[in-house]
UniProtKB/Swiss-Prot annotation:
Protein name: Retinoblastoma-like protein 2
Entry GO terms, CC: chromatin; nucleus; transcription regulator complex
Residues recorded as bearing Phosphoserine in the entry: 410, 636, 659, 669, 684, 942, 946, 960, 965, 967, 975-976, 1031, 1064, 1076, 1108
Chain residue ranges for the region called Disordered: 1-43, 649-698, 806-825, 932-995
Biological source species: Rattus norvegicus (Rat)
GO biological process, one term: chromatin organization
Post-translational events: During G0 and early G1 phase of the cell cycle, phosphorylated on Ser-636 and on 5 sites within the domain B. Phosphorylation on Ser-669 in G1 leads to its ubiquitin-dependent proteolysis.
Spans annotated as Domain A: 414-613
Biased composition regions of type Polar residues, renumbered to the chain: 656-674, 935-950, 958-969
Keyword Membrane assigned: no
Phosphothreonine: modified positions: 414, 639, 968, 980
GO molecular function per UniProt: promoter-specific chromatin binding; RNA polymerase II transcription regulatory region sequence-specific DNA binding
Length: 1135
């Protein structure tokens, strides 16, 4: 692969990644060409390659110039002829002038010929081409074309694997036929053979698929198109005179007379679509729709153009001896012209004897007459499967957040069966529905104070116009694309109204009779919901869907789109497993990078929140946090874990935290006017108000005690500020005396607390503690107060906090009782808090996985997490236009470095690539400098034009030592070749200021300069007292968060077992596998069958200790009796 040349150790991430990826690609046997000018031998091989391809001079010169440029900047590992093939393909796909003074795309040089002459397989080409696109900085439209080309190849490879067994099911084995004798030109033409039909049917299918661009990379529709081709060829084969030599007599779709079972003979060819669907994972309704609207009109056009010869009225006769040779030849020629004109892959290579070498997969059909597979064929089939798994083109990987409760697909499940199952589930969900609101939904909408029915209908109409405009047919393509778009949108409308009704019903159950007009009038909610429905429909037809295309055409910000995903999953129980995985994957993409784009509304929400990012502890329920350093007791008095920090989190949050979040919470914004200078709301939490919290940055402003004088300095609070009174505080004076004093403070404009001088009794005299008020730096706020920050005295805050509000009239209003963990709850229900709760959980899961693979201890993992949280809270601009994984990997490296447990970037990225969401672009193309809008920075919360500009004042104030130069990776020198393109100067560089580089450049130039001061607090050289406490780490969920419906016909669900105290045992029956008696299972079956609930006496829960509804158990005898009942239950269950 490509790697920077002349880099000192350790190597840059691109080089490290390349070498390891090449080992996966199997290129280790090839020699590597060092960076520099290409040798004469390479140029000679290139000239020979161009001569064999009959390449024109312009493409030849451009390809060689591109290769020279790449070889001077990168070390091209592997066969140099393979890299030359990539350069030639790019040059061949450029627009060239024509004789008619127009332009044509490509020079009609086949990609298949390029690969054959360069002795490169398709899988190798796709792997090399992705790296060449990164090095050459090719424009997005070219990358999209390559991705579509690879997707078409993957779809065809998967379908070809299905084509073989289906063909062998309805036709005889091609190996069983006798070899044909040589005949003269004037001899009578012989009937076609099964081998010829095998080739003809496949070529006819791929030619038809190529002429339907909207379904060429659509797995479900392409598969049904194949079934249509087999159905047509099979029907024609039954009318041949030698049909007994062609058709498999064991095929279950026909009777002995050659016609489908349960049908009457007719002149039209028989239709076996329904039988093929039932035998081979097809959907009858979809297949018949493809046959009627796509296949038959297209085949009729082929008859009109004389590409197929026979009876046009019933589409038969092309397999007759007089027509087959001409038809086969004409279709082959037409397909060759299509491949040369479009630069597409020649998918006939699947039929060749050298398919193993050309595709890197397998050869056609079975390699031996016995029907067994050879070892080479099995090996090549495994290679294809590895490529499919690695490319993730047709399958949805389990998100890392779900690997604990979602298993990978079974080996026997194919991509086709998975896709058809998803589509079948969609049809089941929409059965009997129409693309209009139901009577119940209409009634619900009319009951709102402002009926949104008309607004909803108008919005859907506008979105349909926008959606259909993106599927306008080309001149050479039929109107099928728009018909397909109409069909998808109609399904999405049905799903939209169905989910909307479920969402409103759930909201009414949670909120009671509250008017929902406010939520139902939100344009972002409805657009996001319909876009989500369209994504589900698109995914069901063509995995992995069209995200983010659908959200972008409707101009739905990703920050708003993510909010509806969980709402959608909770409201629709009929979603199949793959769809849920896909939606979870989309949510992860939004959380880790899409929501952090420059123009994202997220930055507006942060600005509305007074430019403050909440910490993990503030947005995460306490029972979802790791607290190994303390005993966490609900309702206990507030005990600050960090010196100099006033905490307002609660111990027991009740059920409201774990309950599903309402739409009001998801689409709410941080309240500015009522909470800007208040610690808590005036309303009690029980009344549904949003409780306030002390802002995370800065928390406390300290008053350094310089001397102890006899003067008393009075402080007059400003009206509108919040007066904070500490019940007790301990002050140690210079003479060693320790006294207890009252301490007061005022909430400052930054949201923190400024303590002012108070009267102190030292040695029997009333004296005042005075001094200048100086705010602490962000680093000091995260840690303890050092001797440089508080001199002469030590201030400790062990007691509860009382909050007083100063009214404009100068009076202090008591805002409640002293602050305790049982009476105060952080604000956790705003849309911004919900977003960061998910971000922290996602980051915690990924970091835990990386630390496990890197063999990092739990102690270091928590330090890494604290560093990562610091970067998010104090320096959120580091995430702008960047990726969450980039900050995680940098945090791992820097904390491992300062704690003397070095982990190289190469090793970190090697483990990162094993995660399902990993992409090479994450560490190869990181934003270094770009045009940034003003929004905030680490210290003054205002973004710099470049994140490399540091706040020198903050750096000079901090007393922490500077990180040693040998603790960082070397910065690439100008003379050395960068591992990835640094400045976008290619065709896609619309922003001249934007500069990108690899992860190490980002670390050295930006990340280290903003994090090093904080990170060095955890170094071994730093004193233990100056080490900030560690941030709490989020727990990893161990169970599935949603229930699963077993059958669409019966309301039977499987869900994680909940706490017994939150359920009503008298209305439910529980069966515990390998624990409950068999009688309990019979009662459940009886209740499902009859609909009657068993009597209370028979509903005693013997297994979990629940009390009998008929008779109470004495508390003192409860445990002994429970043990005896449990023993009886176990004995009965074992029989």
């Amino acid at each position: 692969m490509a790697s920077g040349g002349n880099q000192s150790s350790p190597p840059p991430p691109a080089a490290a990644a390349s070498s390891e990826e090449e080992e996966e690609d199997g290129d280790t046997a090839d020699r590597a060409q060092p960076a520099g000018s290409p040798s004469h031998q390479i140029q000679q091989r290139f000239e020979e390659l161009c001569s064999r391809l009959n390449m024109d001079e312009a493409a030849r010169a451009e390809a060689w110039s591109s290769y020279r440029s790449m070889s001077e900047s990168y070390t091209l590992e592997g066969n140099d002829l393979h890299w030359l093939a990539c350069a030639l393909y790019v040059a061949c796909r450029k627009s060239v002038p024509t004789v008619s003074k127009g332009t044509a795309e490509g020079n009609y040089v086949s990609l298949t010929r390029i690969l054959r002459c360069s002795e490169q397989s398709l899988i190798e080409f796709f792997n090399k081409m992705k790296k060449w696109e990164d090095m050459a900085n090719l424009p997005p439209h070219f990358r999209e074309r390559t991705e579509r080309l690879e997707r078409n190849f993957t779809v065809s490879a998967v379908i070809f694997k299905k084509y073989e067994p289906i063909f062998q099911d309805i036709f005889k084995y091609p190996q069983e036929e006798q070899p044909r004798q040589q005949r003269g030109r004037k001899q009578r033409r012989q009937p076609c053979t099964t081998s010829e039909i095998f080739h003809f049917c496949w070529v006819l299918f791929i030619y038809a698929k190529g002429n339907f661009p909207m379904i060429s990379d659509d797995l479900v529709n392409s598969y049904h198109l194949l079934l249509c081709a087999l159905d047509l060829v099979y029907g024609n084969a039954l009318q041949c005179s030698n049909r007994k030599e062609l058709v498999n007599p064991n095929f279950k779709g026909v009777s002995e007379d050659g016609h489908p079972r349960d049908s009457h003979p007719s002149s039209d060819p028989p239709c076996v679509i329904e039988k093929l669907c039932s035998l081979h994972d097809g959907l009858v309704l979809e297949a018949k729709g493809i046959k009627q609207h796509f296949w038959k009109p297209y085949i009729r056009k082929l008859f009109e153009k004389k590409l197929l010869r026979g009876k046009e009225e019933n589409l038969t006769g092309f397999l007759e001896p007089g027509n087959f040779a001409e038809s086969f030849k004409a279709v082959n020629k037409a397909y060759e012209e299509y491949v040369l004109a479009t630069g597409s892959l020649d998918e006939r290579i699947f039929l060749g004897e050298d398919a193993e070498e050309e595709v890197g997969t397998f050869s056609r059909c079975v390699s031996a007459a016995s029907g067994t597979e050879s070892a080479e064929r099995t090996q090549m089939r495994d290679i294809l499967q590895q490529h499919l798994d690695k490319s993730k083109t047709l399958r949805v990987c389990n998100p890392l957040t779900g690997v604990r409760y979602v298993q990978e697909n079974s080996p026997c499940v194919t991509p086709v069966s998975t896709a058809t199952h998803s589509l079948n589930r969609l049809h089941t969900m929409l059965a009997g529905l129409r693309n209009a609101p139901s009577e119940k939904l209409e009634q619900i909408l009319r009951s709102c104070s402002r009926d949104p029915t008309r607004a909803i209908a108008d919005r859907l109409r506008e979105m349909y116009e926008i959606y259909s405009q993106h599927f306008q047919p080309d001149e050479n393509v039929s109107n099928c694309a728009k018909e397909m778009a109409n069909k998808h949108f109609r399904f999405a409308e049905m799903l939209y109204y169905k989910v909307l009704e479920s969402v409103i019903e759930q909201e009414q159950k949670r909120l009671g009779d509250m008017d929902l007009s406010g939520v139902l009038e939100q344009d972002a909610f409805h657009k996001s919901l319909l876009a989500c429905c369209l994504e589900v429909v698109a995914f069901s037809y063509k995995p992995p869907g069209n995200f983010p295309f659908i959200a972008e055409i409707f101009d739905v910000p990703h920050y708003h789109f993510y909010k509806v995903i969980e709402v959608f999953i909770r409201a629709e129980d009929g979603l199949c497993r793959e769809v849920v995985k896909h939606l979870n994957q989309i949510e992860e993409q939004i959380l880790d990078h899409l929501a952090w784009k420059t123009k994202s509304p997220l930055w507006d929400r942060i600005r509305d929140n007074e430019n403050r990012v909440p910490t993990c502890e503030e947005v995460t329920p306490p029972h979802n946090l790791e607290r190994t350093d303390e005993i966490y007791i609900a309702g206990s008095p507030l005990t600050p874990r960090r010196v100099g920090e006033v905490r307002t989190d609660a111990g027991g949050l009740g059920r409201s935290v774990t309950s599903p979040t309402t739409l009001y919470d998801r689409y709410s914004s941080p309240t500015v006017s009522t909470t800007r200078r208040r610690l808590f709301e005036s309303d009690s939490p029980s009344e549904g108000s949003t409780a306030g919290r002390i802002p995370p940055q800065p928390l406390v402003n300290a008053v350094p005690v310089q001397n102890v004088s006899g003067e008393t300095v009075s402080v007059t609070p400003v009206p509108g500020q919040t007066l904070v009174t500490m019940a007790t505080a301990t002050v140690t004076a210079n003479n060693g005396q320790t006294v207890t004093i009252p301490v007061q403070g005022i909430a400052n404009e930054n949201g923190g607390i400024t303590f002012f001088p108070v009267q102190v009794n030292v040695g029997g005299q009333a004296q005042a503690v005075t001094g200048s008020i100086q705010p602490l730096s962000a680093q000091a706020l995260a840690g303890s107060l050092s001797s440089q920050q508080v001199t002469g005295t030590t201030l400790q805050v062990p007691g509860p906090v009382a909050i007083q509000q100063i009214s404009p009239g100068g009076q202090q209003q008591n805002q409640g009782q002293p602050l305790t963990s049982s009476s105060i709850r952080p604000r956790k229900t705003s849309s911004l808090s919900l977003f960061f709760r998910k971000v922290y959980y996602l980051a915690g899961v990924r970091l835990r996985d990386l630390c496990t693979k890197l063999d990092i201890s739990d102690e270091l993992r928590k330090k890494i997490w604290t560093c990562f949280e610091f970067s998010i809270v104090q320096c959120p601009e580091l995430m702008m236009d960047r990726h969450l994984d980039q900050l995680l990997m940098c945090a791992i490296y820097v904390m491992a470095k300062v704690t003397k447990e070095d982990k190289s970037f190469q090793n970190i990225m090697r483990c990162y690539r094993t995660q399902p969401q990993a992409r090479s672009q994450v560490y190869r193309s990181v934003l270094i400098k770009g045009k940034r809008r003003n929004s905030g920075s680490c210290e003054n919360r205002s973004h710099q034009n470049s994140p490399t500009e540091l706040n020198t004042d903050r750096a000079s104030r901090d007393s922490s030592p500077v990180m040693r130069s040998n603790s960082t990776l070397p910065v690439p020198q100008p003379s050395s070749a960068p591992p990835t393109p640094t400045r976008l100067t290619g065709a896609n560089s619309d922003i001249e200021e934007e500069e990108r580089g690899d992860l190490i450049q980002f670390y050295n130039n930006i990340y280290r300069k903003q994090i090093q001061t904080f990170a060095m607090k955890y170094s071994q050289a730093n004193s233990q007292m100056d080490t900030p406490p560690l941030s709490p780490y989020p727990f990893v969920r161990t169970g599935s968060p949603r229930r699963v419906q077993l059958s669409q016909s019966h309301p039977i669900y499987i869900s994680p077992h909940k706490n017994e105290a939150m359920l009503s045992p008298r209305e439910k029956i529980f069966y515990y596998f390998s624990n409950s008696p068999s009688k309990r299972l019979r009662e459940i079956n009886s209740m499902i069958r009859t609909g009657e609930t068993p009597t209370k006496k028979r509903g005693i829960l013997l297994d979990d200790g629940s009390e009998s509804p008929a008779k109470r158990i004495c508390p003192e005898n409860h445990s002994a009796l429970l043990r005896r009942l449990q023993d009886v239950a176990n004995d009965r269950g074992s029989h």
